[in-house]
Amino acid sequence: MRTLLTLALLAPLTMAQDYTWREALNAIRHVETGSHKTGLGVVGDNGKALGPYQIWSPYWIDARMDYGTHASCLSDKAYSEHIVKRYMLRYSRKCTTRLLEGRGTLADIERISRIHNGGPKGYTKLATRKYWVLVQKRLAYNRNASIMAP
């Protein structure tokens, strides 16, 4: 029974569909901060990871932000999302662009989520596979929830 439920949840992900940047962010945010509705104020990894996307200082630096501070991630969701976008445009421009245009693939979301979790080469690291499975499950859940919504 559990196998059938898992297959039912993941089935929509196997069909050719376009994905959006918002869908990717929503799934990543949920994996990063779980049941916390907005992720604002969430501090993780002994104070090193801040806000809805659990952004570390080196990630913030790599995003090459020209305003704000790393601490701004803690209380500003839009700022945090801008950091993620800049980081992904730097390390995975094609995938990010397709997602921003609403024509992303599941592979695009896999790549950016694994980079988010494991750094610029995160998509090649075995250690980021479990993270990707969590993002993929959340993506499936979100898609199924939107289909069932009135």
Name the predicted role of every residue range.
Residues T3-P12:
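Sec-dependent N-terminal signal peptides
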Residues A16-P150:
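Catalytic glycan-binding domains that act on GlcNAc-containing polysaccharides
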